[in-house]
Structures are given as structure tokens and as C-alpha cells.
Swiss-Prot record:
Location of the region described as 6 X approximate tandem repeats in the Swiss-Prot/TrEMBL record: 2-315
Protein name: Fucose-specific lectin
GO biological process: adhesion of symbiont to host cell surface via host glycoprotein
Free-text domain note: AFL adopts the six-bladed beta-propeller fold and contains 6 binding sites per monomer, each located between two adjacent blades. The 6 binding sites that are non-equivalent, and owing to minor differences in amino-acid composition they exhibit a marked difference in specific ligand recognition.
Alphabetical list of Pfam families matching this protein: Fungal_lectin
Gene: fleA
Subunit comment: Homodimer.
Outcome of gene disruption: Increases lung infection and lung injury by A.fumigatus.
Binding site for Zn(2+): C244, D246, H252
Keywords recorded for this protein, A-Z: Lectin, Metal-binding, Repeat, Zinc
Similarity remark: Belongs to the fungal fucose-specific lectin family.
UniProt binding sites for alpha-L-fucose 5: R230, Q242
Keyword Protein transport carried by entry: no
Annotated organism of origin: Aspergillus fumigatus (strain ATCC MYA-4609 / CBS 101355 / FGSC A1100 / Af293) (Neosartorya fumigata)
Function noted in UniProt: Multispecific lectin that is able to recognize L-fucose in all possible linkages. These could be found not only in decomposed plant matter in soil, which is the natural environment for A.fumigatus, but also in various epitopes on human tissues. Mediates binding of A.fumigatus conidia to airway mucin in a fucose dependent manner.
């Protein structure tokens, strides 16, 4: 069975999520092309036609990043396949961000990843999307207008893109990790560290994934040259798989997490760390609940892996 609320959610919608600990925001597209916000502040709410933050082309990717929840940025594609930005600042509310004015043209099948650079109070943004020549392009905001950054080379047309930023305690500046799929269907990582810049090598994290699989990533517990990362993608068994990077072990643990519909998009958020009885993980996806509702998976130290909210509002 479906519900009137679930029927408003686009099947295979782009999904993005941001948080400040367990204060959660989830973004998705409705069947009319509008981008809506559902939120968790002790209980789930919103996600209705009154909670629209902007409009995008139908089937657009949805990416988001935040500084706590004081500054939120949500990225989608226009009908003309240019990047656009919906911005929220506490005290101001939602407005159209400056990225749209730059008219950065991307491939019609481009996905998007977005990060605020970690470890600085400055609002510095990095967006990753696929150009019409199928290369992955970085777009940068450092407070003085949007500019093209580093081109990270060719990728599978329509590849998913995951990204995270963190700051090693012994490094003078933020690090970035991004993941995408290559033409031979490998899932690979590119890495940026402040003392090195972008490393030239691609690190394979999974040998063969379904073409255009969704990719989402998070990191936590940054320490002295140490980090913990979790990367998620939809495998050919129609379940989300998790790939773990743990300090001292590298990429080591890969396995299935939870079933989804074919072609589901995926969003991940985390807070806390192993050192502080964490982390907490939250995954968002579509698994067929009420046909098209967005569903939640939870991991924490106390209870391990389990399904969370079965259907986010408006379902």
C-alpha cells in the first residue's frame, strides 16, 4: 500500500541529509520537481508542500552540506543542466545561493557531491559534478565568488559521487576524500591533503559495482593522521553495501547493510566517534515502504544495525 503523502515523493528521488548531532535535516524531490525538507527535532516533521526550499529539474541529483545547522547548502540541477544552490543561514532563512549565477554547465546525467571544508570557521565550499566531457570537476567557494577548481579526470558517464571533508589534528588545513565510479565499473577514491594537494592515484575500494550506482560517504573521529570513513553504494543484490576505512586497517570491511529498491539514491550522516562511545550513523534511501517513501537505517554502539523510521514525512 501507498499513502497520499508517500505518493508525493518522487520514486528514485535524489536524497541528501545534514545534521548537528541528532538534529537532522533530509532533502528530497517531490513529483512536481520541488525540493522539500523533512526534519527531526525529537520527532519527525515537515516534508510537505509547505516545506519547499526550491525547484529543480525532475530527476535531479540532490546534495547537501552544512556547518552545524547554522549554514546549510543544497545543490541540484536546473532544467538547463547548470548547477544551482539553495542556501540557509540562521537569522536569514532560505534564499537562492550564488552558484546558480555562475552558470556552470554539467552533463545532463551528472550527480553532485558537496562539502564544507572541515576545521575552519570560514565558509569554504567544494562541489563535485560531472562535466559534459565526463570528467569530474571541482567547484570552489572561498568567500570571493564561485570558481572552477581541480579537474579530477574521467569517470563513468552518470557516476555517483560521494565526498567528505575532515581535518587531521596534526595537519594545517582540511583534507578531502571523494569517491566515484570508473568506466570499468570500479569504485575509486581520490584524496586531497593540505601538505600534498590532490594525490594522482586512484584507490580502488570495490572491484565491480552496478553502473551509475549511488555513492554516499561520511567520516568521523579525526585524530593524529587518523580518520574513520564509511562509504555506501547500492550493489547488484539491491542492498546498500558499506565499505569501511578504519585507522590502522585501511579499507578492510565490506558487506551488505539493508535492502533497497533498484536504483535507490543514498544519503549518510554521522556524529560522534568510537573514542566517545559513538559514532551514530543514519542512512536514507528508498526500500519500497509505501512504494516511494524515504526510509532510515540507524547504527549506534548500543544497538548496532537496525531500521529507524520506516517512512519519513510526508509519508
Amino acid at each position: 500500500m501507498s499513502t497520499p503523502g508517500a505518493q508525493q515523493v518522487l520514486f528514485r528521488t535524489g536524497i541528501a541529509a545534514v545534521n548537528l548531532t541528532n538534529h537532522l535535516r533530509v532533502y528530497f524531490q517531490d513529483v512536481y520537481g520541488s525540493i522539500r525538507e523533512s526534519l527531526y527535532e525529537g520527532s519527525w516533521a515537515n516534508g510537505t508542500e509547505k516545506n519547499v526550499i526550491g525547484n529543480a529539474k525532475l530527476g535531479s541529483p540532490v546534495a547537501a552540506t552544512s556547518k552545524e545547522l547554522k549554514h546549510i547548502r543544497v545543490y541540484t540541477l536546473t532544467e538547463g543542466n547548470t548547477l544551482q544552490e539553495f542556501a540557509y543561514d540562521s537569522g536569514t532563512g532560505w534564499y537562492n545561493g550564488g552558484l546558480g549565477g555562475a552558470k556552470f554547465q554539467v552533463a545532463p546525467y551528472s550527480r553532485i557531491a558537496a562539502v564544507f571544508l572541515a576545521g575552519t570557521d570560514a565558509l569554504q565550499l567544494r562541489i563535485y559534478a560531472q562535466k559534459p566531457d565526463n570528467t569530474i570537476q571541482e567547484y570552489m567557494w572561498n568567500g570571493d565568488g564561485w570558481k572552477e577548481g581541480t579537474n579530477l579526470g574521467g569517470a563513468l558517464p552518470g557516476t555517483g559521487i560521494g565526498a567528505t571533508s575532515f581535518r587531521y589534528t596534526d595537519y594545517n588545513g582540511p583534507s578531502i576524500r571523494i569517491w566515484f565510479q570508473t568506466d570499468d565499473l570500479k569504485l575509486v577514491q581520490r584524496a586531497y591533503d593540505p601538505h600534498k594537494g590532490w594525490y594522482p592515484d586512484l584507490v580502488t575500494i570495490f572491484d565491480r559495482a552496478p553502473p551509475r550506482t549511488a555513492i554516499a560517504a561520511t567520516s568521523f573521529g579525526a585524530g593524529n593522521s587518523s580518520i574513520y570513513m564509511r562509504i555506501y553504494f547500492v550493489n547488484s543484490d539491491n542492498t546498500i553495501w558499506q565499505v569501511c576505512w578504519d585507522h590502522g586497517k585501511g579499507y578492510h570491511d565490506k558487506g551488505t547493510i539493508t535492502p533497497v529498491i533498484q536504483g535507490s539514491e543514498v544519503a549518510i550522516i554521522s556524529w560522534g566517534s568510537f573514542a566517545n562511545n559513538g559514532p551514530d550513523l543514519r542512512l536514507y534511501f528508498q526500500n519500497g515502504t509505501y512504494i516511494s517513501a524515504v526510509s532510515e537505517w540507524v547504527w549506534n554502539r548500543a544497538h548496532g544495525s537496525q531500521l529507524g523510521r520506516s517512512a519519513l514525512p510526508p509519508a
